[in-house]
From Swiss-Prot:
ATP binds at residues 261-263, 348-351. InterPro entries: aa-tRNA-synt_IIb, aa-tRNA-synth_II, aa-tRNA-synth_II/BPL/LPL, Ser-tRNA-ligase_type_1, Ser-tRNA-synth_1_N, SerRS_1_N_sf, SerRS_core, tRNA-bd_arm. L-serine binds at residues 230-232, 284, 384. Pfam families: Seryl_tRNA_N, tRNA-synt_2b. Belongs to the class-II aminoacyl-tRNA synthetase family. Type-1 seryl-tRNA synthetase subfamily. It is found in: Cytoplasm. One of its GO terms (molecular function) is ATP binding. One of its GO terms (cellular component) is cytoplasm. Gene3D superfamilies: Bira Bifunctional Protein, Domain 2, Serine-tRNA synthetase, tRNA binding domain. Homodimer. The tRNA molecule binds across the dimer. CDD domains: SerRS_core. Keywords: Aminoacyl-tRNA synthetase, ATP-binding, Cytoplasm, Ligase, Nucleotide-binding, Protein biosynthesis. This is Serine--tRNA ligase. It comes from Erythrobacter litoralis (strain HTCC2594).
Amino acid sequence: MHDIRQIRDNPEAFDAALARRGHEPVAAEILALDEQCRAVTTKMQEAQSRRNEASKAIGQAMGQGNTEKAEALKAEVADLKQTLPRLEDEDRELKMRLENALAVIPNLPLDDVPDGADESDNIEVGTWGTKREFSFEPREHADIGPALGMDFETGARLSGARFTFLRGGMARLHRALGQFMLDRQVSEYGYAECAPPVLVRDEAMYGTDKLPKFAEDSFQTTDGRWLIPTAEVSLTASVMDQILDDAALPMRLTALTPCFRSEAGAAGKDTRGFIRQHQFEKCELVSIVRPENSAAEHERMTEAAESVLQALDLPYRKMLLCTGDMGFGARKTYDLEVWLPGQGAYREISSCSNTGDFQARRMNARYRPEGEKKTAFVHTLNGSGLAVGRTLVAVIENYQEEDGSVAVPEVLAPYMGGAMKLEPTP
């Protein structure tokens, strides 16, 4: 959500920032609605004030024996009581229209975000690791996986397209990866482990900018709750409508949860394999910080996500997203893309975003700076540390052997009960 004062103070700069994201100008429309809203609010407040004054004056007139004046004041109060409900309704409606108009405007990019139209304009800002040289032609995970317990047929039979049933060693490796990620973020980077609900109300989805813009990308239950598309929703919204102590910041939260996405906009993409699923697990990172610390926290969070890939010895590149490829609520985003030798391509495995106070305004999350009476909005950040399913894919493709087996990364040995290889079944 945007600060209306920012638009009032410099509408041209606001529209110019939106134009960098390929968005049409909206300042004039927003300010016209804002002017209507303020005019009606003023009118309503004046009517309320006059009603109170006139009501008080009735008693004074009666005490002075001025019946005629008292009757006139009573008539005025009666008129105001009829007028006020209409003004109050109009005030509520205009405020709702203004909020709805602001709610669908994306966040403004920071100055150091490159301009661009789509992912082809993203900038590579770093790489890590050495791509393995194979003595055989590496295969894709969708070809290797079935013999190792990645059962696409049963998943589809049970639930339809984009669902997978993991068995045996494959299921254990998937679990090991998630536990390793969670343990690392807690022990190495000081994130507090959480186990949040995966069903949330509208308010949590709205506060984390998933509604109303992306309703079709999420699953809703019959009672109106939403299955979380990411634990970002539950973790970030945990401070909704709160005023935090300055000493409580930074607040770093992590959770390993199932996530659910309808993938409405992904028709025809990654229809094969385990890359794009309706249900998947992810180790989510959320930071809630003072405004002056959000830029440094963004770098720290991205480093935390990178550390998992480095520990697993998975080659990757770090991309700074351009204005045209950033998510709706982000003002700056880094994507980590892991190398998949079977596909011969880098694929996104983590996205770390700084949203500034964009989400905090939507969910009214504030803190009280030490020694000050006034509160201020916090800044929120979120990132994947990492997507478990895609990491499983990366391990399969990077650690595959010619016989169809897959070696287990050394750091996962404590989680695998000593099993250091997945062997194909005949």
